[in-house]
């Protein structure tokens, strides 16, 4: 027998550097190596002695490089497969792509095996309780199993793919997974109680010791493979240690199934397990490939003489999904890609990828779960046509982006408020349910019907706001606590008004104004609002007491009843303004009179005059008239202004209240 020898200057995997020396007085010019010193294990070479010198039983010559002698000189090509192409996580998938890329035919031989005529249903039963998480399950059986090492060619291919050879039966399942991309599992029939396989959800308190020797607690949302009594595998992740293949196994049950990808990923993540099987299942596999994979495993069993396959399979098939049908429009694809590819060439390309073209529809093959929309079809055409063959096109000039009318209106409102001396502020769109109590909102108010946040940062940010007033008061209170003597603020933000349990809320924009200190009073706030409305070109507005527009703005309960008003444009309420109620003011800890307003920006934008009507300058100078009136204290100024305007007609330009005495 020949043995591996490391000559002077060689570096071994363990970090050992071979140099000339003396061993027991004898000059040493190298070292005979064991498996461990070469970084190999008995699984790689089952016939070798674990601790002694490695005796090479392969066909080799003296002086031959050890890599070549034991089959480690093969070239490995590493592919980085993106998560949207699980069909390429296999040799067959890559061969399919290579055949199309190089324009060669793909000659895939359908697996065949003879098998015994034994009736499998007499010794095995399969039941799938959760057909949503396992729409397809196929079981096959191999009798008179002969456990032993796999042939050299299989071991070398497994090693080159990063898989450790174990024994012929386990190696076959791994080999088929690498070849077809479909994970398989093998059970020892002796440990499948009553010959019954049940695919079900785990029960509370159940546990399983997996093949890695770890005991893992299961939860009801996890899908498992069980026998009549206990779990024997975690579906799509790893098998159980108890039912695994052993040296004295006589009968094996092969499993080939399709498990729902999201469920496999959640289970693997919760158990802290990442296996080759789960990595494939969680990306989505070809449900049509289960039977082909199982047949290939049986073919290899016969080829290696590892046992006697049973020809009959037991299959549970509850698939309801149909192949995706995607619109096919060659003209759109050419416009999308900037190409001039003929329909015939596109059809030829797509059919070479097993994508059927039926008129104006493409039918996706079962293994291409990434094909969903026309852009995906265009991508297939482009990558086979060659990205470097797509001509460069000059970017076409496009019109400069313009603000929408709504954005222009909001921008103008902001600019006007800044021009009036107000500072902009920005608050969170979520708030606390307690804010309604702080402004004295009635318990049955519709504003208390809010959208609850599923994962809030805390109780103070647990709902979406239905009114912007509390947010403005929070900012004013913060400024007051920080000893800002005079503050004038505005905010343009959204309110979130629920529309139904399964629909998105309405999100109207609101302009909220808040001020205190300095020259702040009701009339200063009213003057700012009037200046804003005039700049935004709203029709003549009037003011009424909140009691005359009851129920329109429920937040008016937070205002002083005698120093507040609802703003009307025509007959339409567009906002309110007034002094904060002393009780609310005290609740927020503000020690001075505070004034607030809220305007319905969205409604105002719809009512604003879109066009400015030109009027020539008057030929005659304006005449100012002072009118002194004696009237009841309860008479609103708006009523007097309305009477004057009606009496004066078109000649009147403006009415202004300038003194009360």
Give a label for each model feature.
Residues 1-118, 272, 276, 280, ...:
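Phosphate-backbone binding interfaces of nucleic-acid-interacting proteins
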Residues 74-82, 135-143, 276-283, 320-337, ...:
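Short, hydrophobic beta-strand segments
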Residues 98-129, 305-333, 337-340, 377:
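Terminal amphipathic helices with adjacent charged low-complexity linkers/tails
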Residues 1, 155-156, 167, 173-242:
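Conserved mixed alpha/beta core segments that line enzyme active sites in large multi-domain catalysts
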Residues 103-115, 165-172, 301-316, 358-359, ...:
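Flexible, glycine/charged-enriched surface loops at secondary-structure junctions
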Residues 326-485, 661:
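Extended, well-folded interaction surfaces typified by the phenylalanyl-tRNA synthetase beta subunit core
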């Amino acid at each position: 027998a020949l043995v591996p020898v490391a000559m002077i200057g060689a570096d071994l995997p363990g970090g050992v550097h071979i140099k000339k020396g003396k061993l027991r007085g004898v000059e040493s010019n190298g070292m005979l190596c064991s498996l461990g010193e070469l970084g190999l294990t008995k699984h790689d070479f089952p016939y070798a002695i674990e601790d002694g010198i490695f005796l090479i039983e392969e066909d080799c010559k003296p002086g031959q490089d050890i890599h070549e002698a034991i089959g480690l000189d093969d070239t490995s090509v590493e592919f980085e497969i993106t998560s949207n192409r699980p069909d390429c996580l296999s040799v067959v998938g890559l061969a399919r792509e290579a055949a199309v890329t190089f324009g060669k035919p793909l000659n895939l031989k359908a697996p065949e095996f003879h098998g015994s005529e034994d009736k499998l249903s007499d010794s095995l039963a399969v039941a799938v309780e959760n057909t949503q998480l396992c729409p397809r399950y196929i079981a096959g059986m191999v009798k008179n199993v002969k456990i032993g090492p796999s042939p050299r060619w299989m071991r070398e291919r497994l090693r080159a793919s990063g898989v450790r050879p174990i024994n012929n039966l386990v190696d076959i399942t791994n080999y088929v997974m690498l070849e077809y991309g479909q994970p398989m599992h093998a059970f020892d029939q002796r440990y499948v109680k009553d010959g019954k396989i049940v695919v079900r959800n785990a029960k509370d308190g159940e546990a399983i010791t997996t093949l890695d020797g770890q005991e893992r607690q299961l939860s009801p949302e996890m899908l498992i493979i069980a026998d009549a009594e206990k779990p024997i595998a975690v579906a799509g992740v790893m098998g159980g240690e108890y039912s695994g293949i052993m040296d004295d196994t006589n009968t094996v049950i092969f499993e080939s199934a399709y498990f729902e990808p999201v469920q496999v990923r959640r289970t693997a993540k919760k158990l802290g397990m990442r296996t080759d099987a789960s990595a494939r299942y969680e990306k989505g596999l070809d449900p049509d490939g289960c039977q082909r994979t199982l047949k290939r495993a049986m073919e290899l069993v016969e080829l290696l003489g590892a046992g006697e396959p049973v020809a009959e399979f037991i299959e549970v098939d509850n698939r309801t999904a149909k192949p995706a049908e995607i619109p096919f429009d060659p003209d759109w694809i050419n416009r999308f890609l900037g190409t001039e590819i003929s329909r015939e060439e596109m059809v030829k390309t797509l059919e070479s990828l097993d994508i059927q073209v039926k008129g104006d529809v493409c039918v996706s093959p079962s293994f291409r779960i990434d094909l969903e929309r026309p852009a995906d079809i265009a991508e297939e055409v482009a990558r086979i046509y060659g990205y470097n063959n797509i001509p460069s096109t000059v970017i076409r000039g496009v019109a400069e982006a313009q603000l929408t009318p709504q954005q222009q209106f909001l921008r103008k409102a902001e600019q006007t408020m800044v021009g009036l001396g107000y500072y902009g502020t920005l608050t969170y769109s979520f708030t606390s349910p307690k804010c309604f109590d702080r402004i004295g909102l009635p318990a049955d108010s519709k504003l208390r019907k809010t959208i609850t946040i599923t994962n809030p940062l805390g109780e103070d940010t647990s709902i979406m706001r239905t009114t912007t007033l509390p947010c403005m008061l929070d900012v004013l209170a913060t400024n007051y606590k920080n000893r800002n003597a005079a503050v004038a603020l505005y905010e343009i933000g959204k309110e979130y008004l629920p529309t139904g349990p399964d629909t998105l809320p309405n999100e109207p924009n609101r302009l909220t104004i808040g001020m205190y200190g300095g020259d702040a009073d009701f009339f200063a706030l009213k003057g700012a609002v009037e200046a804003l409305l005039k700049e935004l070109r709203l029709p003549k507005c009037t003011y009424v007491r909140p009691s005359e527009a009851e129920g329109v703005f429920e937040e008016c309960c937070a205002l002083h009843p005698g120093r507040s008003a609802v703003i009307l444009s025509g007959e339409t309420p567009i906002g309110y303004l007034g002094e904060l109620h002393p009780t609310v003011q005290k609740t927020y800890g503000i020690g001075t009179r505070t004034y607030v307003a809220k305007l319905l920006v969205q409604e105002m934008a719809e009512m604003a005059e879109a066009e400015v009507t030109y009027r020539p300058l008057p030929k005659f100078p304006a005449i100012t008239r002072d009118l002194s009136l004696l009237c009841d204290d309860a008479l609103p100024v708006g009523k007097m202004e309305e009477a004057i305007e009606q009496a004066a007609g078109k000649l009147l330009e403006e009415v202004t209240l300038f003194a009360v005495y």
